């Protein structure tokens, strides 16, 4: 299977999961969750879904993680309705720390600029 297909499937899953989270999942724990990236396994059996949440509070992050785990079945079922694939991949949710890392770098650069 070519990388183009894997990338396209990952992009489609990202788009659909974002839409499902905002329109179909009513759990308040996942209301601020945004999907940032989806990485597919080579055989399309597993999709690692990276997410971010607006809140920096550890309790909100933990609630979002629990909410996503509880909603995985619903999300997968809705993906099955939307995608034309033989088998819908298993979803593994993982927090994306790249945005927090980028914000920290921005803050450090601003502090450096103030010192000069």
From Swiss-Prot:
Disulfide bonds: none
Example of a GO biological process term: maturation of SSU-rRNA
Keywords noted in UniProt: Cytoplasm, Ribosome biogenesis
Function according to Swiss-Prot or TrEMBL: One of several proteins that assist in the late maturation steps of the functional core of the 30S ribosomal subunit. Associates with free 30S ribosomal subunits (but not with 30S subunits that are part of 70S ribosomes or polysomes). Required for efficient processing of 16S rRNA. May interact with the 5'-terminal helix region of 16S rRNA.
Transmembrane segments: none
Species per Swiss-Prot/TrEMBL record: Streptococcus equi subsp. zooepidemicus (strain MGCS10565)
Assembly: Monomer. Binds 30S ribosomal subunits, but not 50S ribosomal subunits or 70S ribosomes.
Top-level taxon of origin: Bacteria
Annotated SUPFAM superfamilies: Ribosome-binding factor A, RbfA
Location(s), subcellular: Cytoplasm
GO MF term set: ribosomal small subunit binding
Principal subcellular localisation of the protein: cytoplasm
Keyword Disulfide bond: no
Family matches, as HAMAP family: RbfA (MF_00003)
Family: Belongs to the RbfA family.
Pfam family, one: RBFA
PANTHER family with a match to the protein in the record: RIBOSOME-BINDING FACTOR A, CHLOROPLASTIC-RELATED (PTHR33515:SF1)
GO cellular component: cytosol
Entry protein name: Ribosome-binding factor A
């Amino acid at each position: 299977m070519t990388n183009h297909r894997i990338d396209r499937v990952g992009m489609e899953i990202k788009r659909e999961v974002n839409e499902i989270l905002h329109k179909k999942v009513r759990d308040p724990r996942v209301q601020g969750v945004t999907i940032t990236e989806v990485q597919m396994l080579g055989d399309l059996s597993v999709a690692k879904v990276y997410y971010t949440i607006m809140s920096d509070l550890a309790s909100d992050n933990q609630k979002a993680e629990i909410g996503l785990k509880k909603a995985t079945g619903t999300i997968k079922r809705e993906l099955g309705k939307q995608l034309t694939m033989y088998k819908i991949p298993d979803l593994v949710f993982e927090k994306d720390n790249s945005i927090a890392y980028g914000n920290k770098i921005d803050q450090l650069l601003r502090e450096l600029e103030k010192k000069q």
